[in-house]
Every structure is written in C-alpha cells, then in structure tokens.
Amino acid sequence: MREPALAASAMAYHPFHAPRPADFPMSAFLAAAQPSFFPALALPPGALAKPLPDPGLAGAAAAAAAAAAAAEAGLHVSALGPHPPAAHLRSLKSLEPEDEVEDDPKVTLEAKELWDQFHKLGTEMVITKSGRRMFPPFKVRVSGLDKKAKYILLMDIVAADDCRYKFHNSRWMVAGKADPEMPKRMYIHPDSPATGEQWMAKPVAFHKLKLTNNISDKHGFTILNSMHKYQPRFHIVRANDILKLPYSTFRTYVFPETDFIAVTAYQNDKITQLKIDNNPFAKGFRDTGNGRREKRKQLTLPSLRLYEEHCKPERDGAESDASSCDPPPAREPPTSPGAAPSPLRLHRARAEEKSCAADSDPEPERLSEERAGAPLGRSPAPDSASPTRLTEPERARERRSPERGKEPAESGGDGPFGLRSLEKERAEARRKDEGRKEAAEGKEQGLAPLVVQTDSASPLGAGHLPGLAFSSHLHGQQFFGPLGAGQPLFLHPGQFTMGPGAFSAMGMGHLLASVAGGGNGGGGGPGTAAGLDAGGLGPAASAASTAAPFPFHLSQHMLASQGIPMPTFGGLFPYPYTYMAAAAAAASALPATSAAAAAAAAAGSLSRSPFLGSARPRLRFSPYQIPVTIPPSTSLLTTGLASEGSKAAGGNSREPSPLPELALRKVGAPSRGALSPSGSAKEAANELQSIQRLVSGLESQRALSPGRESPK
C-alpha cells in the first residue's frame, strides 16, 4: 500500500510552476489505490507538503515542512467510507491556511443512559473476522461550531490500559499484560468535510464503524485485540481538506462510559440481555434462534394449534359421517328401463346428504370408499323390469363391501379373477337373456337430458366421479357436441352432472372409449368386480348402473368448446386425490350410457376392463400394476373388432384387446360384441352426429348381441 504514497512523494519534489495549479493532489493517488478507505497508511515526509511556486526552493522547503508536520502530528491516516471525488484538479488555495475562526465546540453523548447501563455491567463489543458494528452506536451531538467554517469529524479507538482481561465469577478481572497493539486506524466520518451548520443540524453518528480482529484487514475496519479494554475518542478538526489533518489542531473528546472490552463472544449474560432488549438487530441471541422470521413463526404456532384443535372434531365428525351415514350406492332408486326420458332424480341423494351433514373436505375419500365397495357382490337380477334390484344375500354382501373396498390389496389371494368362478355359471346364464332384453329396452329407454347442478353440495350417488380423464385423442376436437357453439364452456369446481344416457347423445362416447383403451372378456357378475378388487384396485365398475348423476370435478380448469389439449388421467382431478378415488373415477367413466345398458355392464364387460389393472404408463393412479399392456398409440379408428369381440365373449381371457369396447362406449351399447367392425368404425368417424343417428345405428346392430355374448 505504500506505492501510491511514494509516487506522491516524488511529486512533492517536482518543480511546480506558479501560474498553474497542482496537477494531482495527494488524495487522487490515495483514491486510485483505495477508492473508499485509507487503511493504515503512514504518509511519508513530503507527501502532504504544499508545493512552492519557486522551482529552486521546492525540494528543500517541501522536505523540511513535511518532516515538521509529520513529527508534530504522528498520525496514520485512514478513511472509511466515501469522500469527495479527488480526481478533479484543485487549486493551491485549497491548501492555504484558513483565517482564524472563533468557535467553542461542545459535544454531548447521545443515548447516555443506555451507555451508563452497559458501563455498570461492563460493556462488551463483539469483534469478528468480517467486522462487527458497535452497539450502542457511538453517536454525539455537537454545538458551538462556526456555521461557515468547515470541519472534519473523526473517531478512533485506543487501548484504555495495559492489561488483558478475563471474565471470572461473573466479573471481569485482569488476566495479564496486554498483547502488542494493533495498527492504529482513524475513522473519518463519511460527511467530512462539512460546515459547522451541517454538523450541528443533527446528531453525528458513527454507526458504520466496524470492529475486527483480522490483522490483515483491507476494509479499513478498526483492528482490536480480544479480551482487551478500549476507549473510543471523538475528534473535531477545523479544516477544509482531509490532507490538512496532519498539521491541523485536534479537539479530542472522551466519554468514560463508552469504554468496552472487545470479545469474540459475549461473556456476561446480563450484557447479552441488554443487547437483546435494545438492539433490533441482535437476532443471533434471541430465544427463537434466528431473528424475526423464526420469531414470527413461533408467534403463529399457537394460532395454528388452535386452528387444528378446532378443525379436529370437524374432521372426526366428517370421517364418522362418511363411514356411518353414507348410504350404500345401490340404495339409490334406479330409473325404470321402460320409463320415458326424465331429468336426473337427485332428491334422495340430497336428502341423504343432508342427514349425514358431512363436511365437503372428505368428499374424495367418501366417493372412493363408496365406489370402491359398490360393485362387490352386485349382479343384475333376472327380473327384467328392474335389472339392478338386489337380492337379500347380495344386500348383505354390499354392506360389507366398503370395508373390502378400502383394503383392495388384502383380497388378492385369489388372483385378479379369483372370485369369478363362484358366480360364473349363474352370470353366463343371465347374460344370454340380458342381451335380448337390451335390444328392446334400448328402444324404450330415452336419453336423459343434461342437468347442470348448481347446488354446491354434491349428491353422493353411485355414479359419482371425482374427475374425468381426457386422453390425447381429444386435441382439436369439440368438448361437447350440443354445446359446441364456439363459446368456452366454464365448469364450476362443484359438480357438473349429467345422466348416464347423455354421453352417446353428446358425442362423448369417444371420451369414454379412449379412457377405457381396451378390454378383456370375462365372466360377468359380482365375481369379476371382486376379482378386480383383488387385483389391487378398488373398482366401481357397475357404479353407474343406476340413473345417478354423473359429476365431473373439473376444478380450476376452463374447458373451451373448441377443444383444449387435455392431460391424461389424473390431470383434472382435484389435487389431493387418492389412488382409490382415481380407480373409482376410472371405473365410473367406463359404464355404458343408459340405465338398461348399465345393467349388463355390471354383469360383465365394464368390471373386467383392463383399464384398471393394466400397466399403462401414462395412467399414474394405479399403485399395483398387472402386466397387461395397452398400446398408448391405439387409434379410435382401430379395426379388428371381430377377433376382439370373440375374445370378449371368452370368460377367462386376460389378453389385451386394443379397442373392443370403443364403439360400445361411444354409442351407448352395454355389452361387448354388440357391433360389427364396420359399424364401430363408422360410429367412431361420425361420433359428433346427432342423437337420432347414433341411436338408430344401434337398432340394427344389437340383434347380434346375444349370439356373440355367449361364452366359448
């Protein structure tokens, strides 16, 4: 750090011409070497000498004057903080002695009472390698200065005695002789020089002064020894330039209550407490550990506990309601197959919901429990007038179904289709009759109109679905045929309900077909539903066999009728959905779209769909994967339904079929093999046609259903 000083010394001996001002003053070199500080810089003789106009006398006079000034002052000047720009040229007048000014400065210590409190206990100041500010900060108020004269205010810290200290028995005592002193540094107030009027206008604070124990510090911090006592000193110098400090008159003021012992960690707990009580930045010593953020967190914890305690009984009540008050899904009144088209009947579901009075939060869990246990033990009765009526043994089985639905993995001992053999013969006999009934019932069964439910509470019916999965086939297609008028369709995060028969009418069959992806053949009846349950997923394959509303929880999504690229399954669920709810949602999306069609769906095709058990990579809801694959690239126009239809008729087939149920889901037919391949392709291509054309396409093709449904 002495190179700039040597350069400046050489300039001091350079002959200056009288008419020309000084080329570069001393401060220019110092600023170039250290922009903000003058760290421990001992100015050499001649560096601060005033240039003389006579070139011949410049060398000797400068050397003599500088030597005398340095001997008198004996100061090592250091500056911390910004000072006026020094690169500009200065005239010689800036270094001329000032006229005599009459002043009588008076200095008072700010926050004297706080200093006294610390002083009584023995003030401690922490020093660190990176530098630490003082607390209380050294702040004084000055009066009696000349308003027009310029003053430089400085501060330094000197050793108070020649001793080293230690804290023992709750008090400070001398521990030995002091260590060698560190380099002395003076802290020049950043506002210096300034007029007396400016200094007297407000307290003069040296709060930016930092203490360090780093001997090689290059930031201009004051270097101190730990466990030594120090005394701050305040200086007033009347000068209009910092370079005049060495030969200016210093007025020094000492406040005994400001002495302190430098420490690397606080020794006296009382001092620590005083700092905590008075210093808003003493975050490292608070009880909370790390300052205001943790303190704020601690303050919020009681309110969080109160909130949790307040919500706990509600959650407990909701869980008990979900387990005890929810009606079994099959108790919902089914729509008569021969009834005329009518809106969805939600009165019983709403009444049961009001009686339960459950909170809306556990709805996904309640839906999953209902739908997971709904199909277990259900099989359509032979009675043609009411195909979904249950016998008493089946009702008894259904009462036990929620418990079985909650634990799908525990029932896996019989294999994915382990329970099918118990009901196989009876279900196959029923299917032959049901296939004939469906052709006649499909003509009588109308299509239930679309009902948008605006009630915030959701009816907990068997056909409920916590989310609808849209496949990648929908990119660029219209969402709903009847609603495709070019306007966006905004769905409330509550329920969007429609009758099960409305899907084929609205061109929604391709949605369900693409969700289904493919299907296995297999025996019908409750055995297959339980078999899928044993496969690790709580299914609700026959959940929509009644005319219960079909809700879509499309929360936080705006679906435009022009068609928005939809994510695959799970993307439209409310975020915290369970695996059980997702599986039930998939199963609820699969059933055929009329009440009579759903009866046969309960018997066979839907509950055996490999959609729930397949290892389809993009369906992330299945925690238990069965090695049955479905090509994700399967197209809606895939043909080959003739061979797949024969597979669908086979009761024990577990082979994947690309799209045997495609057209069936699309047009609303309930059973496999109901359509010819050409009919399926035609309906897939014309999926957005009117309701009449779709229904009329069924009438000519359902005659094939009984023959192809028979097991091989």
From Swiss-Prot:
Q: What is the effect of changing R132A?
A: Abolishes binding to T site 5'-TTCACACCTAGGTGTGAA-3' DNA sequence
Associated disease: Vertebral anomalies and variable endocrine and T-cell dysfunction: An autosomal dominant syndrome characterized by skeletal malformations primarily involving the vertebrae, immunodeficiency, endocrine abnormalities such as hypoparathyroidism and growth hormone deficiency, craniofacial dysmorphism, congenital cardiac anomalies consisting of double-outlet right ventricle, pulmonary valve stenosis and atrial septal defect, and developmental impairments.
Name of the gene this protein is made from: TBX2
| Name the UniProt record assigns to this protein | T-box transcription factor TBX2
Identify the tissues in which this protein is expressed.
Expressed primarily in adult in kidney, lung, and placenta. Weak expression in heart and ovary.
- Originating organism: Homo sapiens
Its GO CC terms are: chromatin; cytoplasm; nucleoplasm; nucleus; transcription regulator complex
Q: List residues annotated as DNA-binding.
A: 109-287
Alphabetic keyword roster: Developmental protein, Disease variant, DNA-binding, Nucleus, Phosphoprotein, Transcription, Transcription regulation
Single GO MF annotation: DNA-binding transcription factor activity, RNA polymerase II-specific
Where is there biased composition of kind Basic and acidic residues?
Answer: 363-372, 391-409, 421-444
How this chain assembles, per its entry, is:
Binds DNA as a monomer. Interacts with PML (isoform PML-2, isoform PML-3 and isoform PML-4).
UniProt-annotated stretches for the region Disordered: 313-450, 637-687
Described purpose of this protein according to its UniProt entry:
Transcription factor which acts as a transcriptional repressor. May also function as a transcriptional activator. Binds to the palindromic T site 5'-TTCACACCTAGGTGTGAA-3' DNA sequence, or a half-site, which are present in the regulatory region of several genes. Required for cardiac atrioventricular canal formation. May cooperate with NKX2.5 to negatively modulate expression of NPPA/ANF in the atrioventricular canal. May play a role as a positive regulator of TGFB2 expression, perhaps acting in concert with GATA4 in the developing outflow tract myocardium.
| Single biological process term from Gene Ontology | cardiac muscle cell myoblast differentiation
Q: Which CDD domains match?
A: T-box_TBX2_3-like (cd20188)
Stored Pfam families:
T-box, TBX2-3_RD, TBX2-3_TAD
Q: Where does it mainly reside? A: nucleus
Q: Which InterPro entries match?
A: p53-like_TF_DNA-bd_sf, T-box_DNA-bd, T-box_sf, TBX2/3_TAD, TBX2_3_RD, TF_Brachyury, TF_T-box, TF_T-box_CS
